[in-house]
Structures are given as structure tokens and as C-alpha cells.
């Protein structure tokens, strides 16, 4: 149990460094772009699945 607490503490420290730095804004923009790309890919594969039936 102590091992998990230490692991999550280290993850929280790393997230705080990224969150309080300027990296968070850049990562959010990249995440938005990736979100829209994957939505388009999902819709294309959905349409291809419907057309093949």
C-alpha cells in the first residue's frame, strides 16, 4: 500500500510541474487537435462499416 502511495505522489509531483509550468497550455492545444482527428477517424470508420453491410 505504501508503494502505491509513493507512486501516486511521484505522479502528482510530475503533474504539478507540468501544470504550473507553461507546458499545460501547449498540451491542451495538442489534445484538442488529437480529439478532432480521432473523431473524424471514428466517423469515417463508422460510415465504412455501415456502407459495407
From Swiss-Prot:
Keywords tagged on the record: Cell membrane, Membrane, Transmembrane, Transmembrane helix
Location of this chain's protein in the cell: Cell membrane
Gene Ontology CC: one annotated term: plasma membrane
Bilayer-crossing regions: 5-25, 30-50
Pfam families: DUF1328 (PF07043)
Topology versus the membrane: Multi-pass membrane protein
Protein family: Belongs to the UPF0391 family.
Protein's name in the database: UPF0391 membrane protein Bcen2424_6479
Amino acid at each position: 500500500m505504501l508503494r502505491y502511495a509513493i507512486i501516486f505522489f511521484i505522479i502528482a509531483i510530475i503533474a504539478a510541474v507540468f501544470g504550473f509550468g507553461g507546458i499545460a497550455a501547449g498540451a491542451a492545444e495538442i489534445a484538442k487537435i488529437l480529439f478532432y482527428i480521432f473523431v473524424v477517424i471514428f466517423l469515417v470508420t463508422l460510415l465504412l462499416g455501415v456502407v459495407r453491410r
